[in-house]
């Protein structure tokens, strides 16, 4: 994901109206070739697609970017991964993508700071300004690290463990579909991105 974001960063910083799916698809293919993703099953990689969400005034490419996985032509999977389930996975992706975007931006900001700080640190008053900037940057990193750890451990890993336990006792297709729905709903609920938490999510 880091490789993909590095490659896409410049393009996604453009206005959403100037973003084209085929251009981003080329960048994703490049990211696959330059990362460990190249060792995944070719069929899996062939089903990974880029989609663009409907844009709003002022949106950048970051705001409309979406990774999708094609399952509609695989009868067994399509039965379990219904349209409603896939839409919920898109909500989860959007949430995780925003977190990764913030982490990526903080990392780039720090890199830029380290590259240019020596040019200004001898200017009177700048040392104190840079000190406060460092403190602010540290607080943001700490906050994002806390959010990231919560999502990984308390949300994703916790829900995945329950899902794997459910799969050990599944009796039929209907139960499998229900377990899949429960898995996704658990993530949405704990990550505060389901409908009942819409107001809280917007405030955050």
Regions found by a protein language model. Give the residues of each.
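Extended, charged interaction scaffolds in large complex subunits
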Residues: 1-204
């Amino acid at each position: 994901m880091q490789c993909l974001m590095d490659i896409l960063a410049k393009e996604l910083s453009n206005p959403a109206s100037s973003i084209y799916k085929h251009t981003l698809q080329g960048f994703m293919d490049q990211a696959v070739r330059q990362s460990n993703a190249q060792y995944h099953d070719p069929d899996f990689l062939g089903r990974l697609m880029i989609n663009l969400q409907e844009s709003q005034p002022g949106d950048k490419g970051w705001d409309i970017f979406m990774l999708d996985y094609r399952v509609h032509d695989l009868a067994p999977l399509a039965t379990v991964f219904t349209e409603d389930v896939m839409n919920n996975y898109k909500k989860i992706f959007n949430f995780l993508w925003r977190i990764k975007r913030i982490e990526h931006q903080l990392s780039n900001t720090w890199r830029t700071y380290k590259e240019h700080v020596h040019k200004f640190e001898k200017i009177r008053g700048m040392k104190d300004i840079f000190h406060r900037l460092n403190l602010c940057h540290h607080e943001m990193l700490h906050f994002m690290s806390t959010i990231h750890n919560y999502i990984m451990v308390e949300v994703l890993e916790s829900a995945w463990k329950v899902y794997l336990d459910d799969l050990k006792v599944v009796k039929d297709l209907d139960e499998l579909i229900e377990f899949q729905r429960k898995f996704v709903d658990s993530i949405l609920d704990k990550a505060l991105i389901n409908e009942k938490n819409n107001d809280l999510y917007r405030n955050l």
